[in-house]
Amino acid sequence: MLKRSKFETTQSQIMHRAEELISAASNRYRITVQVANRAKRRRYEDFENNEDAMMKPVLRAIIEMSDELTQPEIIGEL
């Protein structure tokens, strides 16, 4: 029996987004560390807020970072 995801983002979409991040980065190691750090930060934020995360922090970090790459207007200017 196949396990269905609760999210509209499929594994192939996640892989495609991760590949986009890696190909856009000048350094594969650095982008990997950035994704890991964001996921770690999200995990601690979810833990501090007593939220039950519906999506794993690494997947959420990949989605957020790829969205920032493809849609720079969501970051906003400081």
Curated annotation (Swiss-Prot):
InterPro entries recorded for this chain? DNA-dir_RNA_pol_omega, Pol_omega/Rpo6/RPB6, RPB6/omega-like_sf
UniProt keywords (A-Z) are: DNA-directed RNA polymerase, Nucleotidyltransferase, Transcription, Transferase
| Gene Ontology BP annotations | DNA-templated transcription
> Pfam families given for it?
RNA_pol_Rpb6
So what EC number does this one have? 2.7.7.6
Summarizing the function annotation, the protein's role is: Promotes RNA polymerase assembly. Latches the N- and C-terminal regions of the beta' subunit thereby facilitating its interaction with the beta and alpha subunits.
Quaternary structure per UniProt?
In cyanobacteria the RNAP catalytic core is composed of 2 alpha, 1 beta, 1 beta', 1 gamma and 1 omega subunit. When a sigma factor is associated with the core the holoenzyme is formed, which can initiate transcription.
Under which name does UniProt file this protein? Answer: DNA-directed RNA polymerase subunit omega
